Amino acid sequence: TGAESGIKWPNDIVLNSKKICGILTELHFTERGCVVIVGTGINVNTESFPEEIKGIASSLKLETGKEVSREALIVSIMKYFEVYYEKYVQTEDLSFLREQYESMLINKGKKVRVLDPKAPYEGIARGINVQGNLMVACEDGTEKCVDSGEVSVRGLYGYV
């Protein structure tokens, strides 16, 4: 479609600078090991949004101008999930995803505002480290490691 798509760190999928998908994960420890629960919300064929989020949220239908088959979409997502999951099972390592994730990181190289409850700050998003934390180069020359559980990141001129 020629639309700009990517990932807004850490877990939003954006299309034309608007959020169309959010992904949440929850980690649980059991006697048998770790369990990760993944939840994904995708705005597929939504045609309107409340006024307060209209500028930052959209749907696949609104951005592409086409009705999207939910069934075909979930089949495609699960196909890719299975491929990546099998690779993880074989290696017990997710580092193979880092380069691909970074190539799709829409705020990489851009000025961001980190809404840290202790003290908000601004800097340039440099990418992610091996733990998936966002690395931000601050104006004072320091580099900060941003943990997704602590803060919210916004673009200087809007959501992205």
Regions found by a protein language model. Give the residues of each.
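Long, positively charged amphipathic alpha-helical accessory segments at protein N-termini or as interdomain linkers
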Residues: 1-5, 15-160
